[in-house]
């Protein structure tokens, strides 16, 4: 899989911002077919950062009610990437 297809976007929430500051962990929305090895390679290549661990979570899409009946949002995959000491990804800085 191409490294540009692995990572879709960074996941920026209150929880991920606290984890970035405390534990040097960043979160991404990734392709559902990507595995931990591909995610690690993509982060190291795209952001020039040293990765120590990757944890993934498959998030189930929510069921939503609409005027036409019941629909479902897509399932998606989230990756928590732990960076080694001294490594930093600067897209969180304003």
UniProtKB/Swiss-Prot annotation:
Transmembrane segments: none annotated. Keywords: Ribonucleoprotein, Ribosomal protein, RNA-binding, rRNA-binding. One of its GO terms (molecular function) is rRNA binding. The keyword Ribosomal protein applies. Pfam families: Ribosomal_L23 (PF00276). GO terms for cellular component: ribonucleoprotein complex; ribosome. GO terms for biological process: translation. One of the early assembly proteins it binds 23S rRNA. One of the proteins that surrounds the polypeptide exit tunnel on the outside of the ribosome. Forms the main docking site for trigger factor binding to the ribosome. Part of the 50S ribosomal subunit. Contacts protein L29, and trigger factor when it is bound to the ribosome. This is Large ribosomal subunit protein uL23. It comes from Citrifermentans bemidjiense (strain ATCC BAA-1014 / DSM 16622 / JCM 12645 / Bem) (Geobacter bemidjiensis).
